[in-house]
């Protein structure tokens, strides 16, 4: 008997065609509990359906997911309607879900909600109990798997943000029967390390079963009673565990937890430089303002100082002196002009000027001016005054006209 050799692609295609031709598999109705739920940004929903003995991968494309009457969650019991086919690229078969109805709530989900309600009534979730996250931690304790992707993400974020931060790793189990015990032990030990400022409790994504260790009641009390603040970064953004509600801060991922715990050195330096610049400008403005006030007061003081008052009075005296001199000089000039005018007038009436024209004056011996001939009759001698001298004469006779 000759056996035909097939390529991988041919084999996967043959299996796919076989499954697609099966009536039952093309109209399958499968009951199970949702696990490992992922809602993609495209709108497609990826998850697994499981029961006590097995599980099958499922996908529900956006066009069908849009018609769902409820929001699927991990732990829900559902009945999924669709067809079973092969994803040729991976060689895996899965259920392509076209519709889904809620059947009931899974056992794990029931246990989760029951514990959540119990701890809520005990006020373990209240914000009043949340410890403040230190802004500038120097040493960060990390409780996680030493081989998991979560630790690598935390280390990478720490190196990127601040290489000076020390990480103290406590290697713990993050899933399985003993996981909760090792996580509790890690919290106790790191609380005894005096210089640990904050603790990160982390693991990567997984199904509700894989994350179940973080829904442990004793672990919840350990987180609540921790003296040091705890940040949880468990699973993906859509995953919520009990410790997320109890912790002092819940981060959607391990990387996000590291972003919160480790301050960015460059950002801090820039903030300090900005503060320095702002303080410098603030102080310069204050100094400038005070200097202006000082100059203003200085001007006022100088304006009212005795020295300035005396100087100003001296200036006033000088001005008055100059004004007085001007007035005196004006008065003198005026009097000079008057004197000159009177002198000219007097000169014009000076008898000597008449003598210059050939006339003479006659005086008696007492130098009294004689203007009539009758006065001569009583005199024997007279004085004759010329323009350039005088003569004494005797009267011999008087002739009348």
Swiss-Prot record:
Chief localization: cytoplasm
A single MF term (Gene Ontology): exodeoxyribonuclease VII activity
EC main group: hydrolase
Localization, UniProt: Cytoplasm
CDD domains: ExoVII_LU_OBF
Superkingdom: Bacteria
UniProt-listed InterPro entries: Exonuc_VII_L (IPR003753), Exonuc_VII_lsu_C (IPR020579), OB-fold_nuc-bd_dom (IPR025824)
Assigned GO CC terms: cytoplasm; exodeoxyribonuclease VII complex
Record's catalysed reaction(s): Exonucleolytic cleavage in either 5'- to 3'- or 3'- to 5'-direction to yield nucleoside 5'-phosphates
EC number of the protein: 3.1.11.6
Keyword Transferase in annotation: no
GO biological process: DNA catabolic process
Keyword list, A-Z: Cytoplasm, Exonuclease, Hydrolase, Nuclease
Family according to the record: Belongs to the XseA family.
PANTHER family in UniProt: EXODEOXYRIBONUCLEASE 7 LARGE SUBUNIT (PTHR30008:SF0)
Database matches in NCBIfam families: xseA
Role played: Bidirectionally degrades single-stranded DNA into large acid-insoluble oligonucleotides, which are then degraded further into small acid-soluble oligonucleotides.
Subunit-structure text: Heterooligomer composed of large and small subunits.
Protein name: Exodeoxyribonuclease 7 large subunit
């Amino acid at each position: 008997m000759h056996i035909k050799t097939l390529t991988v692609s041919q084999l996967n295609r043959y299996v796919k065609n076989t499954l697609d031709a099966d009536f039952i598999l093309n109209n399958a109705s499968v009951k199970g509990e949702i696990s490992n739920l992922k809602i993609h940004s495209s709108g497609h929903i990826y998850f697994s359906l499981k029961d006590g003995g097995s599980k099958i991968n499922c996908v529900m494309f956006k066009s069908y997911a849009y018609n769902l009457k409820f929001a699927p969650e991990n732990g829900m019991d559902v009945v999924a309607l669709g067809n079973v086919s092969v994803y040729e690229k991976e060689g895996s078969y899965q259920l392509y879900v076209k519709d889904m109805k809620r059947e009931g709530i899974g056992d794990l989900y029931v246990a989760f909600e029951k514990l959540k309600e119990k701890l809520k009534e005990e006020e373990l979730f209240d914000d009043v109990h949340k410890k403040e996250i230190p802004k500038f931690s120097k040493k960060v304790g990390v409780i996680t798997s030493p081989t998991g992707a979560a630790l690598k993400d935390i280390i990478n974020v720490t190196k990127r943000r601040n290489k000076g931060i020390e990480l103290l790793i406590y290697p713990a189990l993050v899933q399985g029967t003993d996981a909760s015990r090792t996580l509790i032990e890690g919290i106790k030990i790191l609380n005894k390390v005096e210089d640990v400022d904050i603790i990160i409790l982390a693991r990567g994504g997984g199904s509700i079963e894989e994350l179940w260790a973080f829904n442990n009641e004793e672990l919840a009390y350990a987180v609540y009673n921790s003296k040091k603040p705890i940040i949880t970064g468990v699973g993906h953004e859509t995953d919520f565990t009990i410790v997320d509600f109890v912790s002092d801060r819940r981060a959607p991922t391990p990387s996000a937890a590291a972003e919160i715990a480790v301050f960015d050195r460059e950002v801090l330096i820039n903030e300090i430089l900005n503060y320095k610049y702002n303080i410098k400008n603030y102080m310069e403005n204050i100094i400038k303002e005070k200097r202006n006030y000082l100059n203003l007061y200085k001007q006022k003081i100088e304006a009212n100082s005795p020295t300035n008052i005396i100087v100003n009075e001296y200036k006033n005296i000088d001005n008055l002196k100059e004004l007085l001199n001007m007035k005196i000089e004006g008065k003198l000039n005026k009097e000079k002009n008057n004197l000159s005018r009177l002198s000219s007038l007097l000169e014009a009436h000076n008898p000597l000027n008449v003598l210059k024209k050939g006339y003479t004056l006659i005086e008696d011996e007492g130098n009294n001016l004689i203007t009539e001939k009758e006065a001569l009759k009583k005199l024997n001698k007279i004085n004759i005054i010329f323009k350039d001298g005088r003569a004494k004469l005797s009267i011999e006779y008087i002739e009348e006209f």
